[in-house]
Amino acid sequence: MALRIWASSTANALRLSSATRPHFSPLSRCFSSVLDGLKYANSHEWVKHEGSVATIGITDHAQDHLGEVVFVDLPEAGGSVTKATGFGAVESVKATSDVNSPISGEIVEVNSKLSETPGLINSSPYEDGWMIKVKPSNPSELDSLMGAKEYTKFCEEEDSAH
C-alpha cells in the first residue's frame, strides 16, 4: 500500500515527470484521438454526457503517456464523486496515477471489464475503456471543461513544456 501511495504521489493527476515521458514530436499520435463531442479536463479525463448520464474515462493522451495499463482501481456503483477529486487509480508499467472526476455526481455504473482486461484503456480509451458512469449532480460543471480543440492545444502546450 505504501508503494502505491508513493507511486500515486509521484505521478499525481496523470502528470508524469519528464524523466519518464518518452519524447514526442509536437503532434504525437494522441491528437488524432481527441474526439469532438466530448469534454476534457486538464487532468486528462474525458466526459461524454448523454441524457441524464455522463461516461468518464482517461484520454488517449493520458494512456499514451502512461504506457501499458496493468491494473485499474475503481469505486463501486452507488457511491459518489466530486469534481477534481480522485475516484480511482490506473497502474501501468511506468507508474501509478490517480484518476480525478471532471464532474460531481452519483456513480451509477462501473466498467467491470477493466478488472479482467485493464488494457482496454490502452486499446480503446473512448469506447471499451470507459471507467465510470455518473448521474451529474451539477450539470453546469460540464461548462468549465475543454472542447476537443482546446484540449488538443492544452496537450501541445503541456508536451512542449516538458
Swiss-Prot record:
Transit peptide, residue positions per record: 1-31
Residues the record lists as N6-lipoyllysine modifications: K94
Gene Ontology BP term (one): glycine decarboxylation via glycine cleavage system
Major localization listed first in the record, in broad terms: mitochondrion
Membrane-traversing stretches: none
InterPro entries, per database record: 2-oxoA_DH_lipoyl-BS, Biotin_lipoyl, GCV_H, GCV_H/Fam206, GCV_H_sub, Single_hybrid_motif
GO cellular component: glycine cleavage complex; mitochondrion
Cofactor binding, per record: Binds 1 lipoyl cofactor covalently.
Family: Belongs to the GcvH family.
The protein's name in its UniProt record: Glycine cleavage system H protein, mitochondrial
